[in-house]
């Protein structure tokens, strides 16, 4: 997306974003290749453990936390930009292909659906031990003693949070990158994924990450705030009862300490007519989260399937609307240039 012929801009934008969405939907992340986020996670783990061992002072750890966060995010975006830049020197087509693959790797829609489906199958067979084992692969809470309802709740909550963190937020930044051809969609999308990975690895309010991870946690909250609200707003419209669902979200979303996860879970609770939140155990420690939604309907396996449908649908609509807005902006800019030449 670097040196793009303005006349080809709409086509290239559609090819990159549309191709990325299709690639994630059909293939997801092949197990045979190392995902970019895994590499980012390895670097974060090495650097954070080194800082924890070498730095004991509270203020120094906070400063190192800022440095770590900015270094990982900027380096991730720059490396993606450099790869595309060098690829374009070889062939513009190669650069587009790399961007398609790179942006697709930032979308977690396919892997999210697979993870949820891996829990659905044993639940249908009444095999709770296997369902707990599958659930433990993608949630942080203790799963050993969860009841069927708690497994269902944890799965829907994971779909809700990861729809925002792993699907629509990367899409938002990829679309934003399209607006700046010299940057491109992949660098911004992978930079956001780096911020999200930092938050998930060091953004804890417990030692030894309290001081080291504060910056990463706060930054990820800010970066996700707008994409989260846009997703919630669109889900409310897709539900067919926007006024009712929005009222529930406005009531319950702010109850959660997180400025984003409460909203993402509250909208799913509202549109599915269920109740989320409650008591969870993390490494044996009880953590009580606020109850979200009115719980008009029971939590069932069908609710997981419905949550996945909403996840896919809101992604598709945001992709289509985002591209429409971007292409309209580009068309307006081109018209103004043409007018000035007259």
UniProtKB/Swiss-Prot annotation:
Keywords attached to this entry: Cell membrane, Cobalamin biosynthesis, Membrane, Transmembrane, Transmembrane helix
GO MF term list: ABC-type vitamin B12 transporter activity; threonine-phosphate decarboxylase activity
GO BP annotation list: cobalamin biosynthetic process
Residue ranges crossing the lipid bilayer per the database entry: 8-28, 66-86, 93-113, 171-191, 266-286, 314-334
Pfam families given in the database record: CobD_Cbib
Pathway the protein takes part in: Cofactor biosynthesis; adenosylcobalamin biosynthesis
UniProt keyword Nucleotidyltransferase, yes or no: no
Superkingdom assignment: Bacteria
Protein location: Cell membrane
Recorded GO CC terms: plasma membrane
Keyword Nucleotide-binding set for record: no
Topology class, membrane: Multi-pass membrane protein
Family statement: Belongs to the CobD/CbiB family.
Role of this protein: Converts cobyric acid to cobinamide by the addition of aminopropanol on the F carboxylic group.
Annotated protein name in UniProt: Cobalamin biosynthesis protein CobD
Species of origin: Synechocystis sp. (strain ATCC 27184 / PCC 6803 / Kazusa)
The organism's taxonomic lineage, starting at the top: Bacteria, Bacillati, Cyanobacteriota, Cyanophyceae, Synechococcales
